[in-house]
């Protein structure tokens, strides 16, 4: 079932202007990353990051994250763009950052990674499948690629936290859920945000 995107009316000297809520938030350099991470969503997030950086790369961008995760390639495209642009990217986790969402949220500018008190974090190893009727050699290729992907993602998580690569590998073996305090201790965020003190 779909949902209605709210419209915001603004008054100016030239009259009224209606914006959908996401366009209005973009004017304040706020990007909403919500729902599963997939190619279409990633392209939209990347375009918004590039637009805001081109508009003014001296101001922070605020990336609000609430996602169960999703595509590794789409998520890494977002992370690469966050690292590519000059603007600092503040990440604010609300609800949950799970799986690929953890990689994205923890890749915000160090010192500017936040989480709301009741949000959750999940790390685990990447998932993949070969499908029915896959040849044995193809299964071996997929398995090798999954191991390479896992190593790359674990290195990103280690770089974004205060944990060793070995600890990340051990913790990501199975679903590892963390509340805000545990996520702060782990080093994926820099502060638990009790109120909107970003601006």
From Swiss-Prot:
One of its GO terms (molecular function) is serine-type endopeptidase activity. Keywords: Cytoplasm, Hydrolase, Protease, Serine protease. GO terms for biological process: protein quality control for misfolded or incompletely synthesized proteins. Its EC number is 3.4.21.92. It holds the Pfam family CLP_protease. The active site is at residues 99, 124. It is an enzyme of class 3 (hydrolase). Fourteen ClpP subunits assemble into 2 heptameric rings which stack back to back to give a disk-like structure with a central cavity, resembling the structure of eukaryotic proteasomes. Belongs to the peptidase S14 family. This is ATP-dependent Clp protease proteolytic subunit.
């Amino acid at each position: 079932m779909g949902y209605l995107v709210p419209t915001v009316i603004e008054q100016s000297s030239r009259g009224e202007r209606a914006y959908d809520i996401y366009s209005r938030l973009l004017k304040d350099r706020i990007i909403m990353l919500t729902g599963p991470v997939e190619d279409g969503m990633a392209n939209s997030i990347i375009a918004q990051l590039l637009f805001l950086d081109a508009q003014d790369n001296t101001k922070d961008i605020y990336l609000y994250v609430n996602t169960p995760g999703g595509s590794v390639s789409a998520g890494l495209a977002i992370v690469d763009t966050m690292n590519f642009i000059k603007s600092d990217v503040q990440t604010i986790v609300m609800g949950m950052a799970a799986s690929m969402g953890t990689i994205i949220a923890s890749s915000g500018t160090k010192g500017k990674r936040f989480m709301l008190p009741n949000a959750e974090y999940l790390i685990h190893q990447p998932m993949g499948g070969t499908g029915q009727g896959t040849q044995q050699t193809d299964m071996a290729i997929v398995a090798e690629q999954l191991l390479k992907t896992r190593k790359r993602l674990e290195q990103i998580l280690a770089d974004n936290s205060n944990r060793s690569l070995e600890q990340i590998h051990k913790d990501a073996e199975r679903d590892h859920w963390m509340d805000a305090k545990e996520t702060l201790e782990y080093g994926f965020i820099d502060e638990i945000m009790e109120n909107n003190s970003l601006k």
